[in-house]
């Protein structure tokens, strides 16, 4: 019997899912269901990497509503309306949410 021995490093980051394409400049998320973004049905949404000023502006606009902060920020980073973000299916909104946090987190810490 020939079995491969797999050495899994528990500190290694999990691989990105197939629906997420990550770079230093942003993240592209493949939607499970095409959604209307800026009046056009699309199956992908791209979020560019944010700057601190943008995050703070969204937090100032919605100081007591974390979900509204996220929706405003995701819309700004994707260049779409908040309505477009809020009309995503929950599964796709969760993909965008996870992808955003994967984009802004530091891997090596």
What are these regions (language model features)?
Residues 2-109:
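Short, surface-exposed, charged amphipathic helix/loop patches that serve as local interaction elements
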């Amino acid at each position: 019997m020939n079995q491969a021995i797999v050495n899994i490093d528990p500190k290694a980051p999990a691989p990105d899912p197939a629906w997420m394409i990550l770079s230093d400049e942003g993240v592209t998320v493949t939607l499970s269901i095409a959604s209307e973004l800026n009046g056009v049905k699309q199956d992908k949404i791209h979020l560019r990497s944010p700057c601190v000023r943008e995050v703070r502006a969204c937090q100032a606009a919605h100081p007591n509503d974390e979900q509204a902060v996220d929706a405003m920020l995701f819309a700004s980073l994707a260049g779409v309306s908040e309505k477009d973000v809020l009309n995503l299916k929950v599964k796709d909104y969760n993909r965008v949410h996870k992808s955003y946090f994967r984009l802004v987190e530091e891997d090596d810490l």
